[in-house]
């Protein structure tokens, strides 16, 4: 009986490949594509929620810098996701908001008077200068880098698809009075969209993946300070 059992185990090992004695870790090379798998960390939804600020300060939101290289639809989806997140953080007074948001016209004039040496890489002193001219307490800067996208799945008549997008954003929030950063990081998050589709009906959407990824970046940003 023992010999038969040993033979069965040996056959199984030869058929499927014997497992190593010690679990093998993924190498740093394997990790390069981990962000765009279909995807284990895909939607970190509902881990954090953006809530309206309860501290009555004034804030200037500088023009969003889009370096994504996406098509028009993707750019619009990303911009709308950013705007929605900011409106959650800073709702208007009629919806209970306690913050004063600088007008787009005033921000444009202040930036014209204090141009950045590098529009896509403003330094602390430049952001503070804009904030002081506007007379605001805080300044917000946002930039989106080119996303890394991947599509997986198959389609014959009925199939499944997954789009995943790794979204990378440079995000800054400056306290003008203290002349210090409240937030100054490059944030990277993954958004994904999956679907089982019939022919081309009801498939996964790359724009939904982008929207989720941008929303996750903005949540990480706007929940870091009140």
Map each language-model feature to its residues.
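Extracytoplasmic/secreted cell-surface and envelope-processing proteins
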Residues: 69-71, 149-155
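N-terminal segment of the mature soluble domain
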Residues: 55-145, 176, 180-184, 211-212, ...
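Bacterial N-terminal signal peptides that target proteins for export
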Residues: 1-9
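Short beta-alpha junctions and helix-cap segments that line functional grooves
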Residues: 127, 153-159
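C-terminal/domain-edge helix-coil "capping" segments
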Residues: 24-58, 88, 130-134, 146-149, ...
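Sec/Tat signal peptide C-region and signal peptidase I cleavage site
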Residues: 19-23
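Glycine-rich, phosphate-binding/catalytic loops in enzymes
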Residues: 78-79, 158-160
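Bacterial N-terminal signal peptides
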Residues: 9-17
């Amino acid at each position: 009986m023992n010999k038969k059992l040993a033979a069965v185990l040996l056959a199984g090992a030869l058929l499927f490949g014997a497992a190593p004695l010690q679990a093998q870790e993924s190498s740093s090379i394997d990790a390069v594509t981990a962000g765009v798998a279909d995807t284990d960390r895909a939607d970190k939804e509902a881990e954090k929620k953006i809530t309206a600020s309860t501290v009555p300060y004034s804030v200037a939101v500088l023009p969003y810098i889009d370096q994504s290289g996406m098509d028009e639809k993707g750019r619009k989806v990303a911009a709308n996701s950013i705007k929605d997140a900011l409106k959650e953080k800073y709702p208007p007074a009629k919806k209970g908001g306690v913050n004063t948001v600088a007008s787009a016209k005033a921000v444009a004039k202040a930036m014209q008077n204090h141009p950045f040496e590098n529009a896509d890489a403003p330094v602390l002193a430049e952001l503070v200068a804009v904030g002081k001219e506007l007379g605001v307490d805080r300044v917000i800067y946002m930039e989106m880098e080119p996303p890394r996208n991947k599509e997986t799945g198959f389609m014959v008549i009925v199939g499944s698809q997954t789009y995943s997008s790794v979204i990378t954003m440079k995000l800054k929030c400056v306290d003008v009075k203290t002349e210090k950063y409240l937030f100054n990081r490059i944030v990277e998050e993954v958004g994904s969209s999956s679907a089982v589709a019939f022919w081309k009906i009801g498939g996964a959407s790359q724009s939904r993946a982008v929207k989720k990824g941008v929303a996750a970046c903005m949540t990480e940003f706007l929940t870091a300070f009140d």
